[in-house]
Amino acid sequence: MRILAILLPILISFFISYITTVWVIRQAKKSRFVGKDINKPDKPEIPLLGGIGIIAGFIAGSFSLLLTDVRSERVIPAVILSSLLIAFLGLLDDIFNVRQSVRAFLPIFASVPLIVYSVGHSIISIPFLGPINFGIFYYIIIIPFALTITSNAFNMLEGLNGLGVGMGIIMLSALAYIGLTHTGPTYQAGLIALSAIFSLSAFLIFNKYPAKIFPGNVGTYFIGALIGAIGIAGFMYTALAILYIPYVVEFILKLRTNFKGVSFGKVDSSGRLYWDEKPHSLTHIVMKMGRFKEYQVVIILWGMEAIFAVIAVILQTTTIVI
């Protein structure tokens, strides 16, 4: 039964994500819902809203978890609803270009399902301080704050083919490993993370260099919120904090530009990326190390996140409540 609970969701997630992404590419081209790939010399137009494929695959796989693991009836609906709410807000942003000042605080509303289902635990084990019980403040402050940070921060470090999706796979892999080596809600959160990994992996086939589709804000907000929701639901707070260290750096770099900075680079005649101004992003710091192809910049950043993922797995010190 446990093997079925693992295999069925990941197979469904991958298959549904794949076929939905193919459909979205076709429909986006027909409706001219496209954006320019700035990091290419010829600036080709690429279909947007690829996040719809990711979401479809994840939801299909997660619902299958409800059929194979009846103990997850509280964790899975909370994670699905929170992620869907933030995805809807991202879709509105893609279509109507919501003001940044408004967009930054919209994820607060997406935290409501996590609060209603009372996922997570108010006792958080903090390195060097030990367990601290935040009581009611955990639900009215920490959960909304955490989901707002994870979704907004993840959306900042994007702009290169496959970058955000690959980072998401690495972060979710760490959470999945932690979850699947524990029991109770942490194990269930690990199953959800595993389903998300395969949904993202199917999408990465089309989003990797050279990209055939972009995730859009609907995709990046969804991935960020999903990572946050899984970390909260599975009591993996320490791991979540460590995994987001690169995004803290990205936030600081963007803050220096009043959040007007970009993550893409400039392209030379050979198709290599460079940046000759003050860095607005971690991508620019990598570009200043040498002139790399776009996929090389992405691989370097993936490698950096992989290091933090290993550290997160090693240092995870959550209090597991079954």
UniProtKB/Swiss-Prot annotation:
GO terms for molecular function: glycosyltransferase activity; phosphotransferase activity, for other substituted phosphate groups; UDP-N-acetylglucosamine-dolichyl-phosphate N-acetylglucosaminephosphotransferase activity. It holds the Pfam family Glycos_transf_4. The chain crosses the membrane at residues 5-25, 46-66, 76-96, 102-122, 123-143, 160-180, 186-206, 222-242, 295-315. InterPro entries: Glycosyl_transferase_4. One of its GO terms (cellular component) is plasma membrane. The keyword Transferase applies. It catalyses: a di-trans,poly-cis-dolichyl phosphate + UDP-N-acetyl-alpha-D-glucosamine = an N-acetyl-alpha-D-glucosaminyl-diphospho-di-trans,poly-cis-dolichol + UMP. Keywords: Cell membrane, Glycosyltransferase, Membrane, Transferase, Transmembrane, Transmembrane helix. It is found in: Cell membrane. Signal peptide: none annotated. Inhibited by tunicamycin. It is a multi-pass membrane protein. It comes from the Archaea. One of its GO terms (biological process) is cell wall macromolecule biosynthetic process. Its main location: membrane. The keyword Cell membrane applies. Its EC number is 2.7.8.15. Belongs to the glycosyltransferase 4 family. This is Putative UDP-N-acetylglucosamine--dolichyl-phosphate N-acetylglucosaminephosphotransferase. It comes from Saccharolobus solfataricus (strain ATCC 35092 / DSM 1617 / JCM 11322 / P2).
